[in-house]
Amino acid sequence: MELVLKDAQSALTVSETTFGRDFNEALVHQVVVAYAAGARQGSRGQKTRAEVTGSGKKPWRQKGTGRARSGSVKSPIWRSGGVTFAAKPQDHSQKVNKKMYRGALKSILSELVRQDRLIVVEQFSVKAPKTKLLAQKLKDMALEDVLIITGELDENLFLAARNLYKVDVRDANGIDPVSLIAFDKVVMTADAVKQVEEMLA
């Protein structure tokens, strides 16, 4: 299959298996959920009644005071006592096979092509690391919410995009399923397309 280059009167021949496969919603969902789960810090921690500081002495005798019976100041019922089901640090990451991950990326890229959300250009750059230059370039292309993927990370482009809302710049090795679906449009250079194709082959 061929992808038309927007800034040139030509087309780029690409693999049908990478940019023309059927959309596997279940696979994409599983990989996106796993990716988001892996980003969780999982460092929360609370103390149980066994871990909080406090005396082990019974606060008052069992009977005869008229008060409710009590055996410990560390009881979860008491103020400054332990937490009943205390949260502990945990690893939320989910295992995703390479084949599944690559399949999800191919599925997303193919769907972007079908929805006309993938724009392929010969090259994409700015002369200087100026936000104004990139903002004007995107305005000329009628792009607002956009992910720009280049073959090599262009420092000028990266610095120019840092202060733009809903604009991100990545190199081909930095793509992930969440960022590909998070933006309205994805702009890829011809070099990036070839690199992604080789990476997912």
From Swiss-Prot:
It holds the Pfam family Ribosomal_L4. HAMAP family: Ribosomal_uL4_B. Belongs to the universal ribosomal protein uL4 family. One of its GO terms (cellular component) is ribonucleoprotein complex. Residues 43-73 are annotated as: Disordered. GO terms for molecular function: rRNA binding; structural constituent of ribosome. The keyword Transport does not apply. Coiled coil: none annotated. It comes from Sodalis glossinidius (strain morsitans). The keyword Ribonucleoprotein applies. InterPro entries: Ribosomal_uL4, Ribosomal_uL4-like, Ribosomal_uL4_dom_sf. PANTHER family: 50S RIBOSOMAL PROTEIN L4, LARGE RIBOSOMAL SUBUNIT PROTEIN UL4M. Transmembrane segments: none annotated. One of its GO terms (biological process) is translation. One of the primary rRNA binding proteins, this protein initially binds near the 5'-end of the 23S rRNA. It is important during the early stages of 50S assembly. It makes multiple contacts with different domains of the 23S rRNA in the assembled 50S subunit and ribosome. Keywords: Ribonucleoprotein, Ribosomal protein, RNA-binding, rRNA-binding. This is Large ribosomal subunit protein uL4. Part of the 50S ribosomal subunit.
